[in-house]
Curated annotation (Swiss-Prot):
It is an enzyme of class 2 (transferase). Keywords: Aminotransferase, Transferase. SUPFAM superfamilies: Aminomethyltransferase beta-barrel domain, Folate-binding domain. This is Aminomethyltransferase. The gene is gcvT. The keyword Transferase applies. It comes from Pectobacterium atrosepticum (strain SCRI 1043 / ATCC BAA-672).
Amino acid sequence: MAKQTPLYQQHLADGAKMVDFHGWMMPLHYGSQLDEHHIVRRDAGIFDVSHMTIVDLHGVRTREFLRYLLANDVAKLTQPGKALYTGMLNASGGVIDDLIVYFLTEDYFRLVVNSATREKDLAWIEQHAAAFGVDIRERDELALVAVQGPQAQEKVQGLLKAKGLSDEDVAAVASMKPFFGKQAGDFFVATTGYTGEAGYEIALPNEQVVDFWQQLLAVGVKPCGLGARDTLRLEAGMNLYGQDMDEGISPLAANMGWTIAWQPEDRQFIGREALVHQREKGTEQLVGLVLTEKGVLRNDLSVRFTDSDGVMREGVITSGSFSPTLGVSIALARVPAGIGEQAIVQIRNRELPVRVTKPGFVRAGKAIVQY
């Protein structure tokens, strides 16, 4: 039987269409996925992301452990609260999961990992943590919500003040730069998200989340479901685990090369040797596609192009959808290296030209691609 988040009954009261998402009953939409998408780009929306897994790591060797476990380097995290995005790789360089890690104190780090990968992630972390004496604690007593959009931060700050947080805590939250987290009273507030908009992701006790949700709705924040979350993240060029990358895909072939910390050269993290070989040999690449003609780019459609040697090459769309912000169809596609600015996608029995772009289409409500 599918699990329920602490907000399940609230979703029903809000009119959500519920679906089974990796073993969790989650809202797909609350009437109009399109309206929910636009509200996040123009104002503020709230998502229930309590199905995701929060894992706290404690121990004097926690930083050393994470420098071995993760492809990005937590040595970069010197200011308490600072976070980074990283892949957690297997020995062959495949992506076990992508996650966010927060540095809280020298012996206390926090991970937020995907729901679909929870069991294998925890098993992998526990397997490698033992040698470092790191204590692992899953924080399933915490709910997680994401409030996203150009008005999101202002509305959350006002609510935190109304809930009795000190002026000092509210000011500290308001002054956070992107990719920071801070414990403010019962709330862990982070300037992270999955939409390409400003906002917060907020962890709070399960028993407080319904009240918090209702108070945000009362100040005009709109509930949003998985459907809008997917089109928003696709417009932002953000990967979805299981579609755009998985254990058989290198981060170098998933537009995650920037998350690999190659220096210092003597840091031996899991998967490094395989990545060095892949970098020398060359890999496929993840690109963006824009279709301006009538039609919708869908997952698993083939993408064809002729390389500089006149050879026909083929790739595949990993994520595709209509873009509500741009009014055209967009996609992420994994293709052989050497693709130019144009390619061909076959939709039913029509061959349609697509423009090849960097894998990112919208930021802060504005187009960042030309087509």
